[in-house]
């Protein structure tokens, strides 16, 4: 069992671009958007993943992720009801942590940054490109985009 502890913020400027060490293209869809158990199919550059997530409890939830053959991921993505999400992810090291900045192109235009933490009470510094904390707000869950 794996627990995901993360915080999500809105982006207020493009300072993340100069600070990033890499960027990646991501396409993802949801076989299940049930809040108790989301099932996501993701193509991350040229690799496929299947992820099952439990219900959000603030900043903590169960997460199980498995690499799958890219051809399987493409076929599963075709089974996902619309919308399929298209985004670019920037990897940004800051303050001893790795921030993931997602720039969504489809189905909505949006920019968010996430940080995964070892514990809910972990103290961390905010990078200069983040604004409002939207952790736990269902409007910003990837599984709810475009609905």
Predicted regions and their residues:
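Phosphate-end processing signature that detects enzymes handling 5′-triphosphorylated RNA
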Residues: 1-147
